Amino acid sequence: MVMSEFVYLYRGEAPSALSPMESQQHMQKWMTWLKQLGEQGHLKDVGQPLERTGKLVKGKQKTVTDGPYAETKDVVGGYSLIEAKDLDEAVKFSLGCPIFEISGGIVEVRPVMKMNM
């Protein structure tokens, strides 16, 4: 079966309301979920969490500003690369993500376009 690649973009607010113990328990849920995806042969790259700071470069003038802003509710907090037979299957796999348990979390599921270089 030919598999396609998809990116999971994890979006949401920082889970600042969690105690250190709750944060550790939540991280363990992430590790368990990602391990299951890997054991099923669907996790191509675990990815990494992203810092909540950075710069934005915008437009023809290449204007540089601070951002994204941590105060923004819809910040990309990390990513993973998975393989699935189609978009529906990729969405199905995302349903077990622990991000849904806190902070109004979102998993954006995007197909990766193949480019011949």
Residue ranges of predicted features:
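Conserved, structured core segments of small domains
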Residues: 2-117
